[in-house]
Amino acid sequence: MSLRAFEQQNVAALQVKFLSHSQISNITMPGHFGQKVLKTLGLNDHAHQQNSSAVRLPGRPAVNNDERGLSSPPNNGTYPRLCRLSDGTILSSFTRFPDGQRSLRVAKSTDNGLTFEDFSEVTRAAGDVDNMFLCEVAPGTILAAFRNHDMGPNGPTHFRITVCRSTDGGRVWQFASQAAEKRPPLGIWEPFMRVGRQGEVQLYFSQEFAHNNQCTMLVVSRDQGSTWTQPTCLHGDQDPLRDGMCGIARTFDNGREALLMVFETTRYGPFSVEALLSYDDGATWGWRHEVFRPRQGHNAGSPQIASFADGSMATIFMTDEDSNHVEWVKNASIKVVFASQPVEGRVQWSSPTLISPASSFWPGIMALDHHNVLATYDRGGPLAKTITWHPA
């Protein structure tokens, strides 16, 4: 469904449905608006804190004018993500909406992300399946994690983070496990996976604890996704903030390996982007700090992060800060900020650079090599362009 058609069918209904809710409400609808709706009525005003244009970086980033599609023509779909395999293949993943259903699809690139061809379907359902994320856990063995919610006439009736597995490089998929599941009304969303130092699979997801509290959770698998530990809340279980949509990249702090997690949150009412650091491979997190706050009354969310060979980082996100009319997630553009390695837990982020104009949605990012990353987003279909890091 096109963005314009989706807006016409759903925006009016959304405004009525959420008018009596608190400032943040989760919805599970198809298309570009199937993540979160933010109501900004009655919020306190906060001063806008500009990211410093004087941040000194150990290199010069360049956004390249080389946009390409992430699937076969006509290249439709949303929520694009990328996964590099050990044989050099790159898989893209995205959600399509055939015949009133949802289809989680995979496309394949064998030329380092220059071109992609449709490759496989992980699952298809009439329920709310979306937010797919791929991770290779052994050569040729790939996990696909995604939200998989049963829907009734009044909303979700069961929440799941489902995991499927492929052992042939992503061509054929089979059910592996439920990494997490729960009953309504409080939901779970937005899985992210990485492989830890000991070869274990770490799966992070967002879980609601109250209407004004959502946290990042972690489950771990040591059998390539067949079974998972009980969920652990990593931070903020008592905070009146809605942290979500996390992404993680590896970096260094004075030679010590570190992980940096970015996520959207609601510290100022509308969404902004913050981060946490871990020095024990994701077991514990701290050193919380701001990555990007848009101008007053506007939003920045859905972040993802990748790092370069020298430990410098690029965080991509969507924001409506350039729009005069705030109706999140409409009117969003895609931007990126950069930072050098942390220094004793401190990170300084640059001012933002535009990647894709409005209306663009649900960005992702993946390292291509030591000095290039591939940034993804949905602007009428899953697209990508490269960002090059020129070390000083």
Residue ranges and their predicted role:
Residues 1-55:
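Low-complexity, intrinsically disordered flanking regions
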Residues 37, 42-392:
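Asp-box/BNR beta-propeller blade signature and adjacent active/binding-site loops
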